[in-house]
Amino acid sequence: MSENNEEQHQQQQQQQPVAVETPSAVEAPASADPSSEQSVAVEGNSEQAEDNQGENDPSVVPANAITGGRETSDRVLYVGNLDKAITEDILKQYFQVGGPIANIKIMIDKNNKNVNYAFVEYHQSHDANIALQTLNGKQIENNIVKINWAFQSQQSSSDDTFNLFVGDLNVNVDDETLRNAFKDFPSYLSGHVMWDMQTGSSRGYGFVSFTSQDDAQNAMDSMQGQDLNGRPLRINWAAKRDNNNNNNYQQRRNYGNNNRGGFRQYNSNNNNNMNMGMNMNMNMNMNNSRGMPPSSMGMPIGAMPLPSQGQPQQSQTIGLPPQVNPQAVDHIIRSAPPRVTTAYIGNIPHFATEADLIPLFQNFGFILDFKHYPEKGCCFIKYDTHEQAAVCIVALANFPFQGRNLRTGWGKERSNFMPQQQQQGGQPLIMNDQQQPVMSEQQQQQQQQQQQQ
């Protein structure tokens, strides 16, 4: 895009809010600069075209963030085109012109390495408005900053809420449509679609929150696979379930019941004939999990053969991973191409077995393939969807497991691997906000060897 076109595009976008990332409820934009042409949604069009069946259907009108029920924050400002040398302390000095600041967060833009962006939250909307009018279009350090109101996500991050990830949304599903689909369930709290703020279009998934764990589970069971605007919903947990209440779910969803294999999909009363692998992630008896037969390595987990009758059951209780922030998941989702569905887990104790690992990884979705390298202390989990792998990466980053803290990142199937520069210095593959490595299995194994030397 030329400078003139970019300026014209910015003028058109000037009154269009962008996404907010704050400690309370956040939705990070696909790019730091609303005027930028680049976004993951655009880059991934070739991969997403086959899945988004509604996009090329002239009868389907895509939803838009502005008209789709999304509200704006009156206390949070988006600051774009920010000089990379600016720290949060420096930025705070500038934005105190409006009044006391509640929070500042500077983000790294993965689509534009030359600038950062930030979110500035005020205690009072009046103060935020003063800062917007005073600083928008002004030069801060070396760059002219672009300031706008931010979209306020309705997703609560409270520990008392239970969040569902809702995927495979049609392009014409907006916030209101998603809310209407779930609002009749008891203890429903909120629902919203995740938007690409470059185009204003849906990213094809959203989140729904409940104040009751039982109601969230019931909503997932009832709505799994149900048609919404022409596409079946795919629902998963976006956060942990309360460990204190696990026994209730174990009685209802014992994944080892009726002599079924520990990695077979459960038979839900509400979804008897649905082959929806995402349902299996939370439907296991943590105290009676069965191990994966060695002969079944490389097979889709949903097609595992029954274990032998003489196979002993594991008695170890496996803890659930911590609650994850839906917006952190969204950030990771956008850090790798949609075609990548493999998560890498490193720093695994060498004595850990498949029986120890599989129940943990099943928390996040339907596992198509699992490769464990105990001598390397790592494994690769190929999930059914890109989103499921992202949830795994976020939830298990630094997660304590048998005396070690796990390391996570994106993996990439060897058959699809394209040569890239060798990673430097054996740096640990740790999930963080600044970079998301996409490495082949061979590279990651070599990296593990370097760390062990």
Curated annotation (Swiss-Prot):
GO terms for cellular component: cytoplasm; cytoplasmic stress granule; nucleus; P-body. PANTHER family: HETEROGENEOUS NUCLEAR RIBONUCLEOPROTEIN 87F-RELATED. This is Nuclear and cytoplasmic polyadenylated RNA-binding protein PUB1. InterPro entries: Nucleotide-bd_a/b_plait_sf, RBD_domain_sf, RRM_dom, RRM_dom_euk, SLIRP/GR-RBP-like. Residues 75-152, 162-240, 341-413 form the RRM domain. Keywords: Acetylation, Cytoplasm, Methylation, Nucleus, Repeat, RNA-binding. Pfam families: RRM_1 (PF00076). One of its GO terms (biological process) is nuclear-transcribed mRNA catabolic process, nonsense-mediated decay. GO terms for molecular function: mRNA binding; poly(U) RNA binding; ribosome binding. May be associated with hnRNA within the nucleus and remains associated during nucleocytoplasmic mRNA transport, once the proteins are in the cytoplasm, disassembly of PUB1-RNA complexes may occur prior to PAB1 binding and formation of a translationally competent RNP complex. Binds to polyadenylated RNA; prefers to bind poly(rU); binds to T-rich single-stranded DNA. Present with 49600 molecules/cell in log phase SD medium. The modification Omega-N-methylarginine is found at residue 260. It is found in: Cytoplasm; Nucleus; Cytoplasm, P-body; Cytoplasm, Stress granule.
